[in-house]
């Protein structure tokens, strides 16, 4: 009898830094990261690094295709604070999208910026 085991790694789980600035009074309350290849149905990952005023922001993993950002399926929003590590459940790949991005929204009317790490797949 033989027993074996192994580790399965998701394909695109390298963290990439992103920075967003929000200013709701100027209509700048929403932004997206650049798109990245989403190779499997695993969770995405986000880690809050910094916020200029300590406020959180709202993050959602969305699909991306040749027409742009796609939100035509069930989306799951996450509140991200500095120091938070979140495995982002999503339905990007299940809905036929091969690329993903993080949709970021301000959680306050103030002018502030945030920095975070993210990856479209997780280990």
What role is predicted for each listed range?
Residues 1-10:
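Sec-dependent N-terminal signal peptides of Gram-positive bacterial secreted proteins and lipoproteins
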Residues 9-123:
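Post-signal peptide N-terminal regions of Sec-secreted extracellular proteins
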């Amino acid at each position: 009898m033989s027993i074996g085991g192994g580790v399965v790694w998701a394909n695109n789980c390298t963290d990439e830094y992103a920075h967003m600035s929000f200013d709701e009074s100027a209509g700048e309350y929403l932004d997206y990261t650049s798109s990245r290849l989403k190779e499997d149905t695993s969770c995405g990952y986000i880690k809050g690094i910094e916020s200029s005023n300590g406020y959180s922001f709202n993050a959602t993993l969305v699909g991306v295709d040749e027409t742009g950002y796609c939100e035509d399926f069930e989306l799951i929003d996450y509140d991200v604070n500095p120091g938070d590590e979140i495995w982002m459940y999503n339905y990007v790949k299940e809905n036929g999208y091969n690329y993903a991005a993080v949709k970021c929204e301000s959680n306050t009317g103030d002018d502030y910026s945030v920095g975070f790490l993210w990856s479209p797949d997780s280990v």
